[in-house]
């Protein structure tokens, strides 16, 4: 398998993430094109989720959490999950468990952030209640910012591109 051909076909970030996801100390990596393609789908999911969040920003959007009394149960849930993720990934990185760290970030983004939290906020984003809408946007942006920071060492190109668009 030629790295240059894989980069041209699937992108640098997908290849880097694949290599990291399957990296374990003392283990050879069994690289296949199907695995790289699978992580390219993950890159696309991240890109689409980011576009969705960014297209819902208002003019007064900012990257800071709202007051605690404004947070709804779903907001508190995702922030709790995010804090746990940050602690676990930090611990994994300190132990050089890169594959474990990226798998946790992958699972959080795919399952918690995209499949659950974004879906839970859709009604609020289209709501007439400006405070509920603004709170949802602020939490969406904050969590996106944090996951981009966690992903950046492994997917520097797409994370930088998205991060430049965050207020």
Spans of model-derived segments:
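Helix-rich, typically C-terminal accessory recognition domains appended to large enzymatic cores
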Residues: 6-167
């Amino acid at each position: 398998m030629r790295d240059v051909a894989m980069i041209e076909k699937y992108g640098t970030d997908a290849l880097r993430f694949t290599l990291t996801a399957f990296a374990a100390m003392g283990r050879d990596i069994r690289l296949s094109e199907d695995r790289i393609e699978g992580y390219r789908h993950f890159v696309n999911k991240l890109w689409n989720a980011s576009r969705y969040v960014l297209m819902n920003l208002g003019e007064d959007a900012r990257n800071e959490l709202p007051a605690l009394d404004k947070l709804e149960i779903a907001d508190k849930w995702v922030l709790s999950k995010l804090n746990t993720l940050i602690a676990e990934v930090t611990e994994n990185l300190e132990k050089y468990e890169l594959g474990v760290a990226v798998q946790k970030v992958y699972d959080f983004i795919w399952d918690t952030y995209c499949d659950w939290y974004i879906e839970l906020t859709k009604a609020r984003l289209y709501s007439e209640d400006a405070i509920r809408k603004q709170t949802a946007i602020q939490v969406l942006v904050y969590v996106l910012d944090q996951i981009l920071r966690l992903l950046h060492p492994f997917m520097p190109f797409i994370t930088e591109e998205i991060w430049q668009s965050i207020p």
